[in-house]
Amino acid sequence: MAKPLTLPSAASLPAVLLEQAARQGRRVALRHKRLGVWRERSWAELADEVGRLAAALAGLGLGPGQRLLALTPPRPQTALLSLAAHWLGAEVAALDPALPAEALSGLIAAAQPTVTLIDGPAQRAVTLAALGEAAPVIYLDARREPQAGGPAGRAYAELLAGQALPPALAATPEQTAFRFFRWGEHGGLETQALSHAFLLQEGGERVRAHGLSADERALAARAFATAEQARHLFAPWLLAGFSLNFPENLATRDQDRRELGPTLVAGTRETYGRLADDVARRLPPPGHWQRRLVDWALSGQGGAPGRALGYWLVRRPLLDVLGLIHTRHPLLLGPPLPAAQAEWFARLGVRLHALPDVARWQEASAPATAARPFVTSAGA
């Protein structure tokens, strides 16, 4: 097990990346499943790629006080480009691409990005509608975008092809690392800014509270589109130096979780609710003898012999189906699960660690181009 990381005096997220590359450069930092194969990058390779991306982003005009907008599903390139933007002293705004188009378009316009990172035609359409044709865009996969080579478009692979040396690290602890946008309950724009210092403090507390080490395997099955993901997954990954693993796509995330066997899962109410519903569909109907066996095994009756038998006959196979058989740190980000689902996981032996959103959202003025989504009045 690696020794705890000693933070640099001027700590920032990319500074911690460089520290990990220096102390455990050959260790796996990131995995991504592509075309059915898990591909790995070491900490040293990650630091080199982030440095080259920083040079490329500087060439696109990104710098201190400016903003990269990430509008992608879970992708390793998003994590690397975020760190590259931080390297330059810029901040990253992350939005969930699954939001309704009307709400998403307004948030994109409100973010006023210098550069936008997108993944496919749907994101391209909503970005162009919100920002116009001249807005600089980075495409994760140019093969999916015939127009990626336009005057305002760059492919991710193009950014890595340059030979420019990495610029000097410009990030400082007090700078904003991530900024999040949302529409409030009454239709007003709200923002939340997280500095490098805050994220490293929160991430350090998470590492200590859960005893996280470089031996963890974490699954990043959601985009970094929430403050909870940045606080409880992104920052701890850099600080503890464990491996961050990305599924091939959202459709394969459950199968990829079973293959990977993560020790750390940072999921939301929707994540764990989906898993509970999936297993419920596989169980025998109530009243069937096999269902009675399942219920008995989950009850923990029969003393130590009964609990051991129930584990091997029922709980272990169910945990294997869920891909949680090796999970020591199941984190629940945001709102809690319904009581029945929380109790069901507890009976399986999965003790969810609830981490609610305690950060404060602040009202902000939306630019004229940021159309608010329609919101009904309280009395409607």
Residue ranges and their predicted role:
Residues 1-41, 45-60, 145, 167-170, ...:
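N-lobe entry segment of adenylate-forming
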Residues 30-61, 66-75, 100-105, 191-198:
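Conserved AMP-binding/adenylate-forming core of the ANL superfamily
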Residues 60-62, 166-174, 179-221, 228, ...:
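Conserved adenylate-forming
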Residues 69-71, 78, 82, 86-117, ...:
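Short beta-strand->loop structural element characteristic of the AMP-binding/adenylate-forming
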Residues 97-129, 202-219, 250-264, 321-323:
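Conserved ATP-dependent adenylate/AMP-binding module captured primarily in the ANL superfamily
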Residues 124-175, 179, 183-189, 197-203, ...:
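ANL superfamily adenylate-forming
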Residues 157, 266, 278-380:
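Gly/Ser/Thr-rich phosphate-binding loop
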Residues 200-217, 224-302, 306-315, 351:
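Conserved AMP-binding/adenylation subdomain of ANL enzymes
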